């Protein structure tokens, strides 16, 4: 997992997840968008794309039933969302254990500013915790430029 919304296999992005909260008189709702590279091959893509992305097909040489995949994805999302209240801290510990940034030096572009530091993980608000220049930065948005 690469904060804020990428799912990686090795160093290659296979999925992106965007979540937006919407509030109305009827209550709050989450709008969740998932983009998953499934049955496409990136073999013919430009070299810069192949360096940072992959697909399930490229990894397994097998196609998947997209309807079954969608059903399973929805089941897993429902399960995870229902566990958020009772297991929130546990789930963030799990998230940090699979984050490719935790325990590494990271550079994040936030607007015109480049913020670099040692990543302590992701807090319960979803902020990336970077320790740089003697202070802890809590980033709620940005683009990860590099990590090493």
Regions found by a protein language model. Name each.
Residues 1-2:
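Conserved N-terminal catalytic core of the sugar/cofactor nucleotidyltransferase
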Residues 6:
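Conserved active-site carboxylates
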Residues 9-148:
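Long, positively charged amphipathic alpha-helical accessory segments at protein N-termini or as interdomain linkers
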């Amino acid at each position: 997992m690469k904060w804020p919304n990428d799912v990686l296999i090795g160093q290659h992005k296979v999925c992106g997840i965007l979540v937006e909260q919407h509030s109305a008189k009827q209550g709050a709702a989450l709008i969740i968008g998932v983009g998953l590279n499934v049955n496409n091959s990136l073999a013919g893509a430009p070299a810069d794309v192949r360096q940072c992305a992959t697909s399930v097909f490229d990894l397994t040489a097998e196609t998947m039933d997209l309807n079954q995949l969608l059903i399973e994805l929805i089941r897993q999302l429902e399960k995870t969302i229902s566990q958020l209240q009772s297991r929130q801290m546990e789930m963030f510990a799990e998230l940090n254990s699979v984050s490719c940034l935790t325990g590494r030096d990271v550079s994040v572009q936030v607007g015109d500013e480049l913020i670099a530091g040692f990543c302590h993980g992701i807090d319960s608000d979803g902020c990336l915790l970077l320790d740089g220049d003697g202070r802890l930065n809590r980033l709620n948005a940005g683009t990860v430029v590099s990590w090493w």
